[in-house]
Swiss-Prot record:
Protein EC: 2.1.1.-
SUPFAM superfamilies given in the database record: S-adenosyl-L-methionine-dependent methyltransferases
Species whose genome carries this gene: Theobroma cacao
Similarity comment text for this entry: Belongs to the methyltransferase superfamily. Type-7 methyltransferase family.
Cofactor stoichiometry and binding remark: Binds 1 Mg(2+) ion per subunit.
Positions bound to S-adenosyl-L-homocysteine: 18, 59, 64, 96-97, 135-136
Pfam families: Methyltransf_7 (PF03492)
Cofactor(s) it depends on: Mg(2+)
UniProt protein name: Probable methyltransferase TCM_000336
Residues involved in Mg(2+) binding: 174, 260, 262
Gene Ontology biological-process annotations: methylation
Length: 349
């Protein structure tokens, strides 16, 4: 499966869209907002460019990316005022895979510009926003054109499903699982780690050419607390997806062979792995590396399991539909998913 041609968050603004089911991602970015804004302030103090180049890598199609830009503009406005500098122009590049619903982002731009002009006597800052489709696992931008790179909830997605998961006959060595689980052989976690190393190293190398000397990056991604790949965090939610798909197999909606060959292109690194890989690649230095845990929450009248199921559906629907075809009932699949999450949570209470 060609991830770059298939993978995308569910577009539009419907009930199952990413725009309606990305509150978890918004909460994560809000939790580290102070770090992002401090980084922007430090950057402007040290460089104070007349034209500030900003890239949001993995912007997706929800409202989160434009809210980030608004926050950045406000911090730069305040900082430039303190320094008695004229406000720079802002060059904003919104990047995601070509399959992303960029139109939803573009349709929200008039409201974004209108909000920025409110309470500003001079009509607002000069902001030039462009969509930049393509994989960030490789070069995207000209040399030395960016000052700040931001990526939230994207770098845990690999460029592809690790090829080493399959034997010489093309059969998965991780049958019945969509990710690393307790029943996975050691070669599975090694395959995922090797793919993450390859991808993350290429990401860092590519960005090092595109960002100016003294530029900054803030990267937010899912990770794991310890060295064990199987925990009650990310691997747990993929385990629930494996079990939900197994129910679809038992109901005759999909073939067992299809389930056995489905693997997610995902990896949750530990902080040690990130730090080691940044040091090994050598282009950047880690200034700050922290782990945050997000509290469970759900919308009013909705169970936690349902909230998680809707989030997973919004990020996995494109891949599931492409792999399993039209025969799979997504509503039933994710209803089962939500129920199982609630059952597991009840056992912990």
């Amino acid at each position: 499966m060609d991830v770059e041609k298939v993978f995308h968050m569910t577009g539009g603004v419907g009930k199952t869209s990413y725009a309606q089911n990305s509150s978890l991602q918004k909460k994560a970015s809000d939790m580290v907002k102070h770090i992002t804004m401090e980084t922007i302030e430090e950057l402007y103090y040290s460089i104070a460019p007349k034209s500030l180049g900003i890239a949001d890598l993995g912007c997706s199609s929800g409202p989160n990316s434009l809210s980030l830009i608004k926050d950045i503009v406000e911090v730069v406005e305040e900082t430039s005022h303190k320094l008695f500098h004229p406000l720079p122009e802002f060059r904003v590049y919104l990047n995601d895979l070509p399959t992303n619903d960029f139109n939803s982002v573009f349709k929200s731009l008039p409201d974004f510009y209108r909000d920025l002009k409110k309470d500003r006597n001079e009509g607002g800052p000069a902001i030039f926003i462009a969509g930049y489709p393509g994989s960030f696992y490789g070069r995207l931008f000209p040399n030395n054109c960016l000052h700040f790179i931001y990526s939230s909830y994207s770098l845990h997605w690999l460029s592809k499903v690790p090829p080493a998961l399959y034997d010489e006959h093309g059969k998965s060595t991780n049958k019945g699982n969509v990710y690393i689980s307790e029943s996975s052989p050691p070669s599975v976690s090694q395959a995922y780690w090797n793919q993450f190393q390859e991808d993350f190293s290429l990401f860092l190398k590519s960005r090092s050419v595109e960002v100016v000397t003294g530029g900054r990056m803030v990267l937010i991604l899912l990770g794991r607390i310890g060295q064990d790949h199987v925990d009650r965090g990310n691997s747990f939610f993929w385990e629930i997806l494996s079990r939900s798909l197994a129910i679809s197999v038992s109901q005759g909606q999909i073939d067992r062979e299809k389930l056995d060959s489905y693997e997610v292109h995902f990896y949750a690194p530990s902080t040690n792995e990130i730090e080691d890989e940044v040091g090994r690649e050598g282009s950047f230095e880690v200034d700050r590396l922290e782990m945050f845990e997000i509290d469970r929450e759900a919308k009013d009248g909705e169970s936690y399991g349902t909230a998680v199921a809707m989030t997973v559906r919004a990020i996995q629907e494109s891949m599931i539909c492409n792999h399993f075809g039209d025969g799979i009932d997504l509503d039933t699949l994710f209803n089962n998913y939500g129920k199982m999450v609630d059952e597991e949570m009840a056992k912990q209470n």
